[in-house]
């Protein structure tokens, strides 16, 4: 039977192509961050998370700007008593000293890119790298992070254009391409209006959604209706659905199906059990029905996923 390999927690190992592979500490899963230096004080990192929480690199007294793009899953950001959730396709700009050093992922599954900038180490103005790119990293951080330290924009064609190609960059052009795309991203942000912001959720809404999810996962064979959930948690159906959708990005039923399929994917990655055996564990006695459910969540069939399971990463190969 296959077993997980234990990685050195938090270490960064330099690879031949200049990247660093980090393994942030996580209590309930696996987190891998593949980072590439781009310019002085600027790096691009590919985040592959199969956990609900991990510890970020954090240096007290140093204020960094993080530009995050979510490809899959969901990223939680807490600012005071408000919670924001980054969904697939969304972009967020945050300041490291304005948020907790722990990153949280409600669905336990996240893939995305983070561009980190240290204004104290980065060029004061990017025009020194390319003429007419009159962008100052310190001014960008002031623009997006002055009021609370967080800004988020919903998925758009412009954001997708910038980030989509970064997930499949050929190795032979990678270093130069990263430079071009980071400059494009920062130039785009310099012209982006700041009034766009995803809605915030209260601690009460987050706690309600979390309680519902824990209940669903404790009894996966049951399929409670919204009315039954409403009675159990003493909240209206509207409160439950709005809170759950806000935190997890899907209905309770879709969430439960997704959690089952991601758990099945873990078994496909790390064990030699047959697909039919794994299907039975999650309540499917028909391999075809399981394959359809698996494909609807993961995007490929169980057999195709298993054959390419080592590539469960958003970093370019």
Residue ranges, per PLM feature:
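Short Lys/Arg-enriched alpha/beta "domain-start" segment
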Residues: 1-14
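Terminal helix-turn-helix DNA-binding modules in bacterial transcription factors
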Residues: 210-218, 223-228, 246-288, 307-317
């Amino acid at each position: 039977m296959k077993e997980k390999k234990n990685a050195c927690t938090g270490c960064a190992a330099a690879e031949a192509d200049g990247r660093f592979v980090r393994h942030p500490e996580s209590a309930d899963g696996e987190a891998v961050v593949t980072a590439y230096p781009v310019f002085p004080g600027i790096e691009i990192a590919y985040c592959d998370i199969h956990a609900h929480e991990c510890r970020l690199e954090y240096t007290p007294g140093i204020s960094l700007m993080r530009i995050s793009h979510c490809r899959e899953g969901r990223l939680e950001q807490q600012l005071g008593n408000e919670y924001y959730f980054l969904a697939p396709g969304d972009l967020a700009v945050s300041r490291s000293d304005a948020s907790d050093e722990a990153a949280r992922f409600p669905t336990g599954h996240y893939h995305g890119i983070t561009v980190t900038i240290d204004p104290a180490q980065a060029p004061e103005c990017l025009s020194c790298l390319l003429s007419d790119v009159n962008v100052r990293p310190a001014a960008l951080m002031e623009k997006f992070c002055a009021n609370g330290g967080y800004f988020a924009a919903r998925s758009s064609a412009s954001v997708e254009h910038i980030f989509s190609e970064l997930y499949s960059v050929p190795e032979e052009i990678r270093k130069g391409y990263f430079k071009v795309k980071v400059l494009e991203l920062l130039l785009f942000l310099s012209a982006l209006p700041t009034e766009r912001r995803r809605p915030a959720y209260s601690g009460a809404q987050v706690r309600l959604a979390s309680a519902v999810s824990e209940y669903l996962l404790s009894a996966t064979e049951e399929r409670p209706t919204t009315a039954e959930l409403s009675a159990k948690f003493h909240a209206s159906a509207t409160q439950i659905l709005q809170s759950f959708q806000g935190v997890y990005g899907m209905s309770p039923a879709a969430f439960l199906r997704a959690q089952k399929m991601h758990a099945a994917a873990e078994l496909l990655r790390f064990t030699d059990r047959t697909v039919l055996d794994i299907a039975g564990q999650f309540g499917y006695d028909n391999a075809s029905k399981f394959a359809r459910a698996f494909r609807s969540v993961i995007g490929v069939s169980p057999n195709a996923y298993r054959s390419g399971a080592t590539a469960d990463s958003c970093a370019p190969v």
